[in-house]
Amino acid sequence: MKDILKLSIAEMHENLIKKEFSAVELTQTHIDAINNEQLNAFITKTPEVALDAARKADHILIHEQDKITPLTGIPVGIKDLFCTKNIKTTACSNILRNFTPQYDSTVVKRLIDDGAVMLGKLNMDEFAMGSSNSNSCFGPVENPWTRADGVKVVPGGSSGGSSAAVAGFLCAGALGSDTGGSVRQPAAFCGIVGLKPTYGRCSRLGMIAFASSLDQAGVLTRTVKDAALMLQPICGYDTQDSTSANITTPRFLDSITNIIKGKRIGIPKEYELSDKYKEYEEVSEMWLKGIKYLENEGAEIVNISLPHTSYALPVYYIICSAEASSNLARYDGIKYGTRVNSDNINEMYELTRGNNLGTEVKRRILIGAYALSSGYYDAYYNKAQCIRRLVTNDFVESFKSVDYILTPTAPKEAFAMDEQLDTLTMYLNDVFTVPASLAGLPAISIPIGLSKNKLPLSLQIIGNYYDEGGILNIASVIEKHTGNILK
């Protein structure tokens, strides 16, 4: 048997059933790996909680076999954006450094109720704002991959801790959140699978809000099958979340048939950037490779146009910043947030927010407050919402003639940890993921190969609303051709 840490969730489950090892042994092996990790992926470790859950899993595996699920005894990590009862939840911000929730978020509760073993909380960009996991009060996360010349690279963001932990074999799968690409982009940088479901498919109760009309929980795993297994329990209607969709959750694993003959795959011309920018050539070559894989399996390739794509990124940053400025207004040191005391209340507000919020978070709050101000609301926020509808309509029209859309996930490979990118260049990392987020569509990132620098490159499959099973199946076909690049 190969290294226990490198098994997939499905393989771990199979071995637990066969009693090749116990859930406690599996969990302890992961705890040992976490204690020796150099990636800075885990910021809060919960070994006692994990071992207690593992013992319960072993009891079920031996004495209550009718209660066994595919996640029984499987060690997972939780992005520090999701509330965990009696366990610190900080959003990697100094302003929440001492916050301990009294309840579990719905998706965390559903994972635990399904038998998963929580190993701890994972590093992230502060309040999920970032594409490199360098905006964290706990310090940056390192990608398990290194460039061919030995240079360390970023894991992507904002779910950088989640992607690094899964790619670094510190947990079997991880919970992340995706607002504009925060599951898919780090999955691409780390060479793993990252799935963002349809907006409303998973409850947002207990997920610290960044941009409420965009935020959605997602999963990061090492295989497509594992993504289906981990996504299954966290989906479903939640009466306590007004944005939760009251729709039946299918069995996602049943959709992975690897049969795609006759499926129409849309290739949007607006995502082809190599004719303008030479640095995108490698990504375009991998995109063509993915197209060939699907074509050889019987899929029909259709050229499509998403004409408002070029507006998606600026629209996204206006909307998400506006919503962030509203959501983060509550952290003032009075009811929420770590207070910096002062005799003057205005000074107390200023010191509390000025000292405890990071540079990127403050930048977006300022952008958002400006966009929502009375003199500029119509010119910026209102106009952005109108263009968001046009971006959404592009997808709606395209899905009348195609079943799925195939694009790159990120325009380039992971960049160096010490590379100082300007803000605009950093934002461009989400150029391919943001459109699906604005439309609320499900999308998955799947590794396609390695760059000349021996770093992962990935493709994104976008599906129609609530067709997570379909995008998992397309991703599985690509995975069949590429194999697991982590090997």
From Swiss-Prot:
Molecular-function annotations in GO: ATP binding; glutaminyl-tRNA synthase (glutamine-hydrolyzing) activity
UniProt catalytic activity: L-glutamyl-tRNA(Gln) + L-glutamine + ATP + H2O = L-glutaminyl-tRNA(Gln) + L-glutamate + ADP + phosphate + H(+)
NCBIfam families in the cross-refs: gatA (TIGR00132)
Any single GO CC term annotated in Swiss-Prot or TrEMBL for this entry: glutamyl-tRNA(Gln) amidotransferase complex
PROSITE patterns reported in the protein's UniProt record: AMIDASES
InterPro entries associated with the record: Amidase, Amidase_CS, Amidase_dom, AS_sf, GatA
Function: Allows the formation of correctly charged Gln-tRNA(Gln) through the transamidation of misacylated Glu-tRNA(Gln) in organisms which lack glutaminyl-tRNA synthetase. The reaction takes place in the presence of glutamine and ATP through an activated gamma-phospho-Glu-tRNA(Gln).
Active site: K79 (charge relay system), S158 (charge relay system), S182 (acyl-ester intermediate)
Subunit and interaction comment: Heterotrimer of A, B and C subunits.
GO terms for biological process, alphabetical: translation
Alphabetic keyword roster: ATP-binding, Ligase, Nucleotide-binding, Protein biosynthesis
Protein name (Swiss-Prot/TrEMBL): Glutamyl-tRNA(Gln) amidotransferase subunit A
Pfam families xref list: Amidase
